[in-house]
UniProtKB/Swiss-Prot annotation:
It comes from the Eukaryota. A motif (Microbody targeting signal) lies at residues 171-173. PANTHER family: 2-OXO-4-HYDROXY-4-CARBOXY-5-UREIDOIMIDAZOLINE DECARBOXYLASE-RELATED. Catalyzes the stereoselective decarboxylation of 2-oxo-4-hydroxy-4-carboxy-5-ureidoimidazoline (OHCU) to (S)-allantoin. It comes from Homo sapiens. GO terms for cellular component: peroxisome. It is an enzyme of class 4 (lyase). This is Putative 2-oxo-4-hydroxy-4-carboxy-5-ureidoimidazoline decarboxylase. Its main location: other. GO terms for biological process: allantoin metabolic process; purine nucleobase metabolic process.
Length: 173
């Protein structure tokens, strides 16, 4: 899909297409729509990320809370968004053994208890062995640093998803 197509979308179509660029946060797409026209993918990204950056900390934490646990119960039940399903499966998280799933569940619970939001990682840049290592490492980070890191991961995920959408055949959206 080209940027002209993006710029010609009405609000409903734009939210339908871009509403999950940030996991389960169609409000961001609805807000970004009013910033049209976009010159290119980077400009579109800039507006998505500026919206996130402009939020108060509680809003940023809310965005993080919209993300599922990696290899969590939603993956096991098959209730992830299509994007998260592909990303987590691609990182090998669907094929974890019972011990690996248990270890990740324990780390996810510790992380949530410590920071108040789920561990967010751009799974496309990771794999089943790196995820628990990174989760354990980030558990030791100061809260303010971890908020910045987690939001950086949200932006990596968003960047990949936006690029996927702009490369996609509009007839398949």
């Amino acid at each position: 899909m080209d940027i002209e197509k993006v710029n010609s979308m009405d609000l409903g179509e734009f939210v339908d297409v871009f509403g999950n660029a940030t996991e389960r946060c169609p409000l961001i797409a609805a807000a970004v729509w009013s910033q049209r026209p976009f010159s290119d993918l980077e400009d579109l990204e800039k507006h998505f990320f500026a919206f996130i950056d402009a939020l108060a900390q509680s809003g940023q934490e809310g965005i993080l809370r919209c993300h599922p646990d990696l290899a969590g119960s939603e993956l096991q039940r098959g209730t992830l968004t299509a994007e998260s399903q592909r990303e987590q499966s691609g990182a090998g998280l669907r094929s974890l053994g019972a011990d690996e799933r248990l270890r990740l569940a324990e780390l996810n619970a510790q992380y949530r208890a410590r920071f108040g939001f789920p561990f967010v990682l751009a799974a496309r840049f990771s794999d089943r062995t790196a995820v628990p290592r990174e989760l354990a490492r980030r558990l030791l980070c100061p809260s303010a640093q971890e908020l910045r890191t987690a939001l950086g991961e949200v932006k990596k995920i968003g960047s990949l998803r936006l690029a996927d959408l702009l490369r996609a055949d509009p007839a398949k959206l």
